[in-house]
């Protein structure tokens, strides 16, 4: 953990002996080396509250300050008689995405932290607290590659940053691959699903589309069935929300990292293109009504748009630049009652997870405290063609 006043905290359970504030101890490194250290502050726990204590004994869960270089899995031991315990291993990250500053025309309107320096500080602070998160620089000083154990973990981090007042752009999540013996391998997950019997068909169909293989299925006659699948980590991107919708909120799913396997093949993404705003302004009901036959729209009348912003899903496979700010021309010719006949279909609203699954490599998710928007990586239409 991390504390703004005392720095990094090593949290663990005391197996034997006693530890006291100010005591000289040894850190047993994972490579077998020993490093001297001192307990500057010692904390215990009282329920969910962390309290400072003078000493602790066997079985106590404590947090030790003053150990800036300690890593998970290392042992804190007596300096005169160091005895390392078996190390704890943390699963390797399986999903990565690039987080960058928000450079859209709406940048700085809705957030308090908008610079790359603020973004880097926040990600570094998260790396100190969350041992399963990795933060790496990219070729751009304004972008950082963040890796974690899954799309949900990274989405939670982005949602936390959004609520803290950060503005950022997020690229498409990708699986981390590795080359072994000349073969590209990808991370696999063991997925356990518990759902009512009537949803077996839709769940197995969705798993098949995501390169999942059923390993086991059991039905104990209670009306619910348990299924186990082996599926690529990238196959689970966006699946949780889809699964809850398909099972009407009655399904339960959990997954664990289950090794590496050769690349399982391409997973079909959306076959449709997008509707892209070609100018800045406010969406009008007149334009939205005329664009409804072209596809599903993501916005309502009065919403602000900018050039390059994705405003809908095209019914065809290509991207289409459209003018959603066009207003109806006034004239002296009127048909009785015709001005009141605008019929609008409710917009399709997306949460952060759905947006991350929807985008392609040439698109980004713009995340601000007030909104989640989709946009093209290159905003100007003449530069995209």
Residue ranges and their predicted role:
Residues 1-97, 107-109, 272, 279-331, ...:
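Conserved nucleotide-binding/hydrolysis modules and their immediate coupling elements
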Residues 8, 116-142, 198-202, 210, ...:
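Phosphate-interacting basic helix/loop segments used at nucleotide- and nucleic-acid interfaces
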Residues 22, 59, 73, 99, ...:
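Residue-level signature of catalytic and energy-coupling elements of molecular machines
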Residues 190-206, 210-213, 226-340:
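Contiguous effector/interaction surfaces
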Residues 31-42, 53-57, 84-102, 130-142, ...:
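Interdomain boundary/hinge elements
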Residues 371-373, 379-385:
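Acidic, low-complexity intrinsically disordered tails
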Residues 138-153:
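Short glycine/threonine-rich beta-strand-turn micro-motifs
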Residues 27-29, 104-128, 341, 345-347:
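A short, contiguous, amphipathic alpha-helix enriched in charged residues
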């Amino acid at each position: 953990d991390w504390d703004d006043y005392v720095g990094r905290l090593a949290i663990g359970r005391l197996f034997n002996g006693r530890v006291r504030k100010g005591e000289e101890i040894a850190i047993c490194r994972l490579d077998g080396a020993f490093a001297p250290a001192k307990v500057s502050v010692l904390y215990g726990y009282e329920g969910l509250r962390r309290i400072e204590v003078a000493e602790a004994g066997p079985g106590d869960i404590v947090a030790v300050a003053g150990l800036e270089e300690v890593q998970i899995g290392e042992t804190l031991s007596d300096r005169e008689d160091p005895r390392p315990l078996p190390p704890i291993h943390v699963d390797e990250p399986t999903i990565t995405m690039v987080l960058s500053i928000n450079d859209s025309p709406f940048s700085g309107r809705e957030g308090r932290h908008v610079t790359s320096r603020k973004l880097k500080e926040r990600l570094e602070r998260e790396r100190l607290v969350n041992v399963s998160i990795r933060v790496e620089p990219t070729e751009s000083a304004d972008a950082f590659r963040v890796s974690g154990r899954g799309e949900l973990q990274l989405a939670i981090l982005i949602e936390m940053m959004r609520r803290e007042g950060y503005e950022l752009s997020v690229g498409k999540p990708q699986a981390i691959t590795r080359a072994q013996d000349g073969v590209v391998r990808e991370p696999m997950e063991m997925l356990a699903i518990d759902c009512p019997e009537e949803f077996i068909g839709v769940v197995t169909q969705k798993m098949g589309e995501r390169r999942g293989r059923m390993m086991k299925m059991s039905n104990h006659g209670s009306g619910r069935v348990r299924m186990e699948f082996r599926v690529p980590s990238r196959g689970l991107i966006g699946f949780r929300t889809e699964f809850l919708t398909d099972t009407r909120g009655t399904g339960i799913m959990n997954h664990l990292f289950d090794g590496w396997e050769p690349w399982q093949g391409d997973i079909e993404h959306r076959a449709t293109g997008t509707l892209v705003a070609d100018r800045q302004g406010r969406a009008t009901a007149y334009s939205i009504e005329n664009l409804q036959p072209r596809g599903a729209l993501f916005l309502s009348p009065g919403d602000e748009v900018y050039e390059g912003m994705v405003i809908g899903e095209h019914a065809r496979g290509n991207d289409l630049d459209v003018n959603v700010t066009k207003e109806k021309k006034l004239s002296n010719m009127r048909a009785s009652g015709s001005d009141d006949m605008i019929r609008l279909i409710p917009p399709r609203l997306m949460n952060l997870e759905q947006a991350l699954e929807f985008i392609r490599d040439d698109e980004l998710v713009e995340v601000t405290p007030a909104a989640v928007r989709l946009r093209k990586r290159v905003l100007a239409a003449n530069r995209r063609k």
